[in-house]
Regions:
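Soluble FAD-dependent oxygen oxidases
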Residues: 1-275
Length: 275
């Protein structure tokens, strides 16, 4: 506590502190000296990596395919998958080209069950493969979560923008925003992709949906109630190389890209650390 006392916080005592720490972040709302967590038996993990790159610089087809993927996120996540993705048509990262990639995983599913979850998406993407896009899908099976983490999740990966001078915004998206209007979704993706000469990086956090929403009745699960109907958090970031362009980039992130994201799902919000 602020007076130096150490207390035990749970749903029965100091529940307001428990709510803030559990639902908002331990490092943000309190100093946690020890904790008790519930453990579960180890389960096998099936993971998938998907990488898409355009042929002949066909970024329109890449953005169309990204739209198709976004529309399938709720189905994928309700089937037990979670993970992270990123994409860009003007990447600020060194030696990176226009591309989309993700790694997703699910526990206690067979490879056959997992592949069926993606049947509809890959049937949709088939029309691009080899004609306008190069699509690479790889499946992995691991005996335990620890083996999966060591191989695919616990490795260093490039994060965010290369420059220390950058601005970002984020938006939580629910199922309706992702599935109701393909035109509206494609317009938002086209806006957050950025124009020529705008090095822009998009990150997708597939951390909602499925069991997260099933547990929404737990009032201590999140400070931000928008999480209780969120499927993905989409983050867009841009960098600038000199001070003179900083305000231009900040205005674009806030009033162009951020507004486009908010318009697609005005009822939810932003992730507090990445607003």
């Amino acid at each position: 506590m602020t007076n130096g006392d150490i207390v035990t916080a749970n749903s029965c005592q100091f529940s307001d502190l428990y709510f803030a720490i559990r639902g908002g972040g331990g490092g943000t709302y309190g100093v946690v000296t020890s904790m008790t967590v519930k453990v579960y038996p180890n389960k096998p993990v099936v993971a998938q990596s998907l990488a898409i790159t355009p042929l002949a610089k066909d970024t329109d087809s890449l953005l169309d395919a990204i739209t198709d993927i976004y529309q399938q996120y709720p189905n994928i996540m309700d089937s037990g998958f979670s993970g992270y993705g990123s994409w860009s048509i003007n990447s600020p990262m060194p030696n990176q080209t226009a591309s989309y990639m993700h790694v997703v995983a699910a526990m206690n599913k067979s490879l056959v069950q997992s592949q069926k979850v993606f049947d509809e998406l890959f049937q949709t993407l088939q029309k691009y493969n080899g004609s306008s896009l190069r699509i690479l899908v790889v499946w992995y099976e691991f005996p335990t979560y620890g083996a999966y983490f060591q191989a695919m999740s616990g490795v260093s990966q490039p994060v965010g923008v290369a420059s220390p001078n950058s601005a970002m915004t984020s938006r939580m998206f629910g199922k309706a925003a992702l599935t109701t209007s393909r035109t509206a979704l494609r317009n938002m993706i086209g806006t957050t992709a950025g124009n020529s000469g705008e090095p822009t990086f998009n990150t997708v956090e597939l951390v909602g949906g499925g069991k997260v929403l099933t547990d929404a009745s737990d009032k201590y699960s999140s400070v931000n109630p928008a999480w209780r109907s969120t499927y993905i958090v989409s983050i867009v970031a841009r960098s600038w190389s000199n001070h003179s362009s900083a305000e231009t980039v900040k205005d674009d992130i806030t009033n162009i890209k951020g507004v486009a994201m908010r318009a697609l799902d005005p009822l939810l919000g932003s992730y507090m650390n990445e607003a």
